[in-house]
């Protein structure tokens, strides 16, 4: 199901679908820059509210599949943009789906390219380590019952912030999809769990 799957997600039909809307929104914000943070927040919030909670948690959230060009290619080879999308994929309600080769940095625009065999020589390089780190955050802190709330998504801004909350946990995520560093909002009693391209004052 390539579009809104609400009509299919019923007890007598399907329990989950491949969430191509998730990929589409990530493509337009992180990879292509077609929408600003406010537009991304609107799309993602609509996606969250569209499905009953049990179905939302079961959505197969993908960035790549055998039917679409590789996300890293959509990013023009910009690894930073791809990594932002992967962080969002791993730290968002649903089931993150990693298409083979993404953890090795595979690229491809045409069908023979994005379906080419796995690059085993580079299977455990920097991309593999990155996926392992972000997946480790998900495994350590999330259990699938968290509520998703947008914290920051201003018009014409490329800084997107959100929270995942449940009893005993408030995990905030800040993603700067712009080219310039962004100041981080001050947070009292907040522990930094993991960061990339960030200082104590700004997010690069």
Task: Describe each model-derived feature in a short phrase.
Residues 11, 15-19, 27, 59-60, ...:
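Generic secondary-structure boundary/loop-capping signal
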